[in-house]
Amino acid sequence: MLPTLTFDLTIQPDWLYEVKYDGFRAILNWDDSGITLTSRNNKPLLPQFPEIKDFLEPLEKLFQPFLPLQLDGELVLLENPYKANFSAIQVRGRTKAAKKIAEHAAKSPCRLMVFDILVLAGRPQHSKTFDERKARLSELFNQLNFPLEADPYSENLLQLVKAHKDFSKLWENVVLHDGEGIIAKQKNSLWEEGKRSLQWLKYKNWKYVSCFITALEKTNGYFYVGVYKEGTIQGIGQVLFGFKPDEKQALQSTIKQNMVREDSQFIYVEPAICLEIKYLELYDNQLREPHFHRFRFELKPTECTYEQFIFKQKNLPEDLDITHPDKPLWKDHDIQKADFILYLREVSPYMLPFLENRILTVIRYPHGMFGEPFYQKNCPDYAPDFVKTHLSEGIDYIVCNNLKTLIWLGNQLAIEYHIPFQTIHSKGASEIVFDLDPPSKEEFHLAVKAALLIKEVLDQLNLIGFVKTSGNKGLQIYLPLPENVFTFEDTRLFTSFIADYLISKDPDSFTTERMKKNRGNRLYVDYVQHSEGKTIVAPYSMRGNEHAGVATPLFWEEVDYSLHPVNFNMESALHRLRKQGDPFKNYFQTKSIQSFGPVLEVLKAKK
């Protein structure tokens, strides 16, 4: 059963919505003869993707009550919960050498994202409605204790594609995570072999590029398009679909009348006709799934540049104009404003959850590091209507709950993002944070020492902590807490206990002395800072310092004396996310299981 492409999706109550992943459509069959995984064209996929079979075979006893079993899904290389890496799985699909296949399977295993069930315990499910099949599929995953939604960090290679009722929220997440799109499915649809159905609709997250026509291919009518890159024409692909018949005919006629040369295959024209094309991504330097969107008669061909093409690939909010994108921001780093905006776009899925529903203080650098910065708490009068605010103690703070607001702030050159320890809805602390701030970068080892000592205590108390760099010269340790349970008076008992513990372990390294002149070269343990109204720099926020630092989340196993704060900058933060994932990925799930209550009771008893 195949979905039909739509450009206009009507939201209806009798439909459900799923993330559309980009990989290989695959049917998993498991019966007495073994496990098979076949593509839509009935091609065996296990030779290229043995990790699926290797994962399932040891679980045969667990699966036995449900066999024979047949599942419908998409074989993908998950990049994040809403996006699969299309180009990477294409490489996997073309790999033939057994050694290379084994290396890929071990290092970057693919996952089968299951969205339908066709046979369960030998009983066909085709006659059931999609709603019924989805319920049975969810029940199966529950019984197996398998992930009920996408998790790129889970070792489980069989994961459920969750069905959502709320299209808007799902679409917001797909756009935020740069996913391919959404599949809409009618609740009462039946599964029909090989049929392209109007009861399943695919709605894609298009990107847009302004380009010009360079040639017409005679045999198939494809229009070749390009952009200017450093003064020369750079081809980016060809387009055929999306034109109305009269538009296509007029365009072909114009090209023939204005050709500069032709050969047996092409009719060539000078750059003159500008148009906008929507596409999914750039794959092998060509537009993937290009469709004509509109003519851009107001554009000059010289305005269709490779730079704007790459910039717009990141799916920035359409109605936001980025001003002065080539403005340099750092003296000793080749970082322009466009680079900073694209950085914010890429880290937004990981940064926004920490900004959500928190009053925001930003530090703006209107001239980059070449001029004076200033703090901004009050929302400026010129802020657009989509920027939401919250009044607190007479100040109308910005609340950054979405990508559009974040990019708008980035365009205002808000480099640093500082947030309180509670949300606007919290009655008490949302987390505990220890700010381990040594006197200088040269004493960074003191922050490492303190962090490792705190980790020992957390482990002994069965508490879960997360660690990040401050982006300057220190480390910060987070303990997520359930909302509306603990007061700041409660958390003060714990922060002062930890401060006293550190000093008792090494009074020559740590101090709670408020006066800087009396601290010497010791690390100041600022447990007083963790209180209502105080702030901390948000995870993934950049810092206005000479090394373009980033408040970078770390894995605990990385925290040792080889760490140095200047190694954590914009470039390294992006590289780490792409290669290692987000160390704070389980942060918010930890809130409900953090066993802080028993620890607090002991501290209160000793008070």
Predicted features and spans:
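Active-site palm subdomain of RNA-directed nucleic acid polymerases
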Residues: 457-468
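Covalent nucleotidyltransferase
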Residues: 22-25, 29-140, 279, 285
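SsDNA-processing nucleotidyl-transfer enzymes
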Residues: 1-4, 58-59, 81, 88, ...
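C-terminal accessory nucleic-acid interaction domains of nucleic acid-metabolism proteins
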Residues: 107-110, 211, 219, 254, ...
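TRNA-binding/sensing appendages of the translation machinery
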Residues: 10-36, 44, 315-371
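Helical (often loop-to-helix) elements that flank the catalytic cores of nucleotide-handling enzymes
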Residues: 232-253, 382-393, 444-459, 479-509, ...
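Histidine-centered divalent-metal-coordination microenvironment in nucleic-acid enzymes
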Residues: 431-433, 466-487, 522-530
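Nucleic-acid 5′ end/cap handling module spanning
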Residues: 2-31, 35-36, 40, 148-253, ...
